[in-house]
Amino acid sequence: MSDSKEPSVQQLGLLEEEQLRGLGFRQTRGYKSLAGCLGHGALVLQLLSFTLLAGLLIQVSKFPSSISQEQSKQDAIYQNLTQLKAAVGEFSEKSKLQEIYQELTQLKAAVGELPEKSKQQEIYQELTRLKAAVGELPEKSKQQEIYQELTRLKAAVGELPEKSKQQEIYQELTRLKAAVGELPEKSKQQEIYQELTRLKAAVGELPEKSKQQEIYQELTRLKAAVGELPEKSKQQEIYQELTRLKAAVGELPEKSKQQEIYQELTRLKAAVGELPEKSKQQEIYQELTQLKAAVERLCRPCPWEWTFFQGNCYFMSNSQRDWHDSVTACQEVGAQLVVIKSAEEQNFLQLQSSRSNRFAWMGLSDLNQEGTWQWVDGSPLSPSFKQYWNRGEPNNVGEEDCAEFSGNGWNDDKCNLAKFWICKKSAASCSRDEEQFLSPAPATPNPPPV
């Protein structure tokens, strides 16, 4: 069987070779038949077609994206060109630019002459307030008027003298402001004059000794108040300055805040204009000097700043010390840390302490023996005085061995704590003739020391 098939195949191969030669084809090396050649050629063509199709699809998919990006880029460039064109269109001519440059140069030079940083901050705050005020300005016509006024002011500032002169002007304005702030109001001046009249009558009637101390203290305060009045030339200067300020404020637009400032300046002007003339001030000062001299010659049972009560003098300190130093402080002025002898004295001292809202040491402790309270003069605490302890006191919490005035009663506390203190000593007796104290005091050119 195999032998019969092989000649058939050979015959078929010869037949195909003859047909190809008749058609003008040559047999290609590597291919045994036309059918094999045609079969491989179709596969190659399909592969090439698929590759070309895939490349075309990729290029087509990229084409719209590149077009949109290019379009957005062109739009951005166009917008930038439009903005640049508008900005260039807003520039003024070259001469205007030069004018702006020169103005900036002048401003830079002016800034270089500004004073220290603290002054710059004050100027900046003032400019901020001015900016807020300008924001409230009325219609355009008024703004133009203000602009013209500012132009004139700028020209005036350009004519100012050197920097030292400007500082002198600023200092003078500062002193003027301080002087105006110290002027007493009219009602205060009348009160001073009326008080002088009452004091003169009171000294002539020679009231009780405790009243004399009150009169002396009032005279001291009045003297200080009169001493703050400026001299007549200074008053005229203040009056002129206020007049100019009033005129300047009167030119401002009608705003509620500006009206309030104008009214305040009017009241200040009226108050300064009504100040007593210099001769009247001198008369008041001389009267005060005479009254003070007369009071100083009066018999005083207690030193100044001490309070008289039932034949004794009491001093409430203005500083604080511990209990032991308070005892020493009273001894240095010939007194002792207060020892209470009666219910009336206790009520008087408790009232003085509560009014001043101070915790003050008294001369009572149990340092010698715990629980046994003694005064600094060695006398024991009376059982009737135990009612003055606050509720729950004395409790000796943390070695509390010294007594103080606290609120409406007594309290024990640590002796090393700093508190106010109260001294007590006997009042002096006045044996001189009362007529001696009513003699008029000679006028003295210089006031006595306070």
UniProtKB/Swiss-Prot annotation:
Pfam families: Lectin_C. GO terms for cellular component: membrane. GO terms for molecular function: D-mannose binding; metal ion binding. The keyword Cytoplasm does not apply. It is found in: Membrane. Disulfide bonds join C302-C313, C330-C423, C402-C415. Residues 1-37 are cytoplasmic. SMART domains: CLECT (SM00034). Residues 309-424 form the C-type lectin domain. Residues 59-450 are extracellular. Sequence repeats lie at residues 96-118, 119-141, 142-164, 165-187, 188-210, 211-233, 234-256, 257-279, 280-303. The keyword Electron transport does not apply. It is a single-pass type II membrane protein. GO terms for biological process: adaptive immune response; cell adhesion; endocytosis; innate immune response. Ca(2+) binds at E393, N395, V397, E400, N411, D412. Keywords: Adaptive immunity, Calcium, Cell adhesion, Disulfide bond, Endocytosis, Glycoprotein, Immunity, Innate immunity, Lectin, Mannose-binding, Membrane, Metal-binding, Receptor, Repeat, Signal-anchor, Transmembrane, Transmembrane helix. Residues 96-303 are annotated as: 9 X approximate tandem repeats. Glycans are attached at N80. InterPro entries: C-type_lectin-like, C-type_lectin-like/link_sf, C-type_lectin/snaclec_domain, C-type_lectin_CS, CD209-like_CTLD, CTDL_fold. The chain crosses the membrane at residues 38-58. PANTHER family: MANNOSE, PHOSPHOLIPASE, LECTIN RECEPTOR RELATED. The tandem repeat domain, also called neck domain, mediates oligomerization. This is CD209 antigen.
